[in-house]
């Protein structure tokens, strides 16, 4: 089962896909901005192994995309655009390959990490083999969630985009993430971009330490910076992200 929520109005739909370790709750600011514009509907989904979506025995970008393709077909969405953050951009590009029989019209990728040094890959693989870790308090779990999801420490604890990042059960608190999802790290970004059959627009927060503008422009010459933003531009400047989506829609 893939957890999702949807809303908004308009003849076109934006499929909002979060990054590794996060949940669909990070899209709340963008959802509000879309609601105010009133031109695009939205559907925000938890990727497999995250939030309220089912855990699987293994994970890959293709497997995550296949689950979302099934959701799109079940919801009879028709033509849609993908807005993906970090890992979500990878999954969006896979969906745009025409391998899944759905009608993606364009992909907006925000802050995808396109270069994976050997040390980063090794760290991700080690995380993927670890058992679920339990915490005594929700605050401890929240601190860990901020780190693994890339949300950082400069977001107030009560903010809605931190919602559903942890789960309370009999043994205490744990992250709402299957550790095995870290196995998706290091997928071939260039191959995914090349496989896309629709327009692709890439962007990053100008302060994002995970990817440079030069790296993005190696894959998409029109890639751009979002001024003043860091890795989580969809939270820091949702209006800019919606503006980029509208620019992409106008190109199609």
What is the predicted function of each stretch?
Residues 19-22, 86:
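Active-site glycine-rich loops that stabilize anionic/oxyanionic intermediates
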Residues 229-242:
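Catalytic histidine-centered segment of alpha/beta-hydrolase-like enzymes
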Residues 168-219, 225:
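Conserved serine/cysteine hydrolase catalytic core
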